[in-house]
Amino acid sequence: MKSALRFAAALLLSTGLAAPAFSTEYPLPAPDSRLIGENQLTTVPDDKQSLEVIAAKYQIGLLGMLEANPGTDPWLPKAGTQLVVPQQMLLPDTPREGIVVNLAELRLYYYPKGEEKVIVYPIGIGQLGAATPVMVTSISQKIPNPTWTPTPNIRKRYAKEGVTLPAVVPAGPENPMGLFAMRLARGSGNYLIHGTNANFGIGMRVSSGCIRLRPQDIEALFNSVPKGTRVQVINQPVKYAIEPDGKRYIEVHQPLSHNDKDDPQTMPIALSAALKTFIKSPQSDSELIKAALARRSGMPVLVSSGEAVEAQKPEEAQQSAQVSAQGQATVETP
């Protein structure tokens, strides 16, 4: 219990809660820094809004909101409930170039060439049995008003549900690829970054392998990203950083499940040799790290050894330290 209370206090201190802001654009930190953004607080206004509506307002994915607010009803969160909006994050450990997709955190990072900024978008990715692969590739084609040609496997899966798909779904409002698509050069070009015609599925595992964005996000990205842009897709459920001031942070997301029986809240997370060294360092608080690995809040947690942690009310600490399993959706769309 003591380590849980210390972890909860550290989480609230390190998240930098501030007044609401809605931009997904962040100034690029120095090369030796990876911490960006500030978390926000928002209050559920009534009993008529789903968590997806609130998440979309702040440009957050649904599972990201659930990680940050365990136990919240995703369909009808209770009016007056105070929610943390997870807008603080650590940049992935990759080159700051082009597009970087981190599957585990269900986010896409875009580094515009020659600009000192990074733009972050929530995404939907491949479901169980149709996972989005890890890769390094590039944008090979930009397609406005795309048609959708379902693969034979996709048509078979739909047929099992009693849905007969046409060979080609024409462009328009009924097309699940939305109004914009960018084809990836990998393999035969079956993977795309595209929009959606649905009002759900962002920040979830719902696609047939493609990377999906909300309509306004894919339009902005489509209009900004040139053909040939580098795209790196990674799977890093744990990110960590030592900032220029010496402070140490760890950000833990629920890992991607491998089957229907996996619980992303409790399934093991593989730790790299470098991460193990980070954890064992005398400059790191191993108890705070252990709590962060269990909590999997999806937010950076300050884990420096010897950091002063202010006291908070026991009920606040208990709520912040609560661990709750959140499943991953398997709705099937492109």
What role is predicted for each listed range?
Residues F222-Q265:
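N-terminal targeting pre-sequences for secretion and organelle import
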Residues M89-N197, N223, V252-T333:
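Gly/Pro-biased beta-strand-loop elements
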